């Protein structure tokens, strides 16, 4: 049975691989659409132009996917799964005990902390540069926001509840809402200026939307879209990490309470 299954899998991979290679070898791409795009782009970075100028709706959808992912994490690992009142009554915990915190999270060794802090600072700086320069160089809001969130996660892992780089959960909620709302409002502004939602405009009454050197073509509202996406990704990934961290602390407290009851 196993040999027949392996043979079927091998044949399937062979047929699929041969089909892909055949398609790539005989692929013909009409340059018409490409020429239209390259004629009308106003941003010096092709990749960023694709993400925000030509498929901004798709980028908005990706942001909403991240929103849904964070909401699901909150449902599964957040307060909706654990009723604080029930847990306090069950395990005779004091009223002042808050289960949704990172208190009690242990720290790593001094060597890890010594290396983690400067690395976190450098990652935050790199993330900011990546967001602000995404319309000129490779990068953007997604990459920069992920870098800053990774710096936050690294600092929390190394320092625990005493992390020097800390985002309060309420602050993350506001930051995520600000990023998503900023993206939507910029799209509305484009609709009022150019007649199309998320239309990229470069100036209003002669005033440049985003300042740029004379030798660099202005990018319009795309830098602001990058900032909005960066805030959204930073807050979303950090919130997911926060919820998973709270889950760890909750499980530890429940285990300790069960041991005391036994």
From Swiss-Prot:
It is found in: Cell membrane. Pfam families: MnhB (PF04039). Keywords: Cell membrane, Membrane, Transmembrane, Transmembrane helix. It is a multi-pass membrane protein. InterPro entries: CPA3_antiporter_subunitB, MnhB. GO terms for cellular component: plasma membrane. The keyword Transmembrane helix applies. Signal peptide: none annotated. Its main location: membrane. The chain crosses the membrane at residues 7-27, 58-78, 114-134, 140-160, 179-199, 216-236. It comes from Methanocaldococcus jannaschii (strain ATCC 43067 / DSM 2661 / JAL-1 / JCM 10045 / NBRC 100440). This is Uncharacterized protein MJ1307.
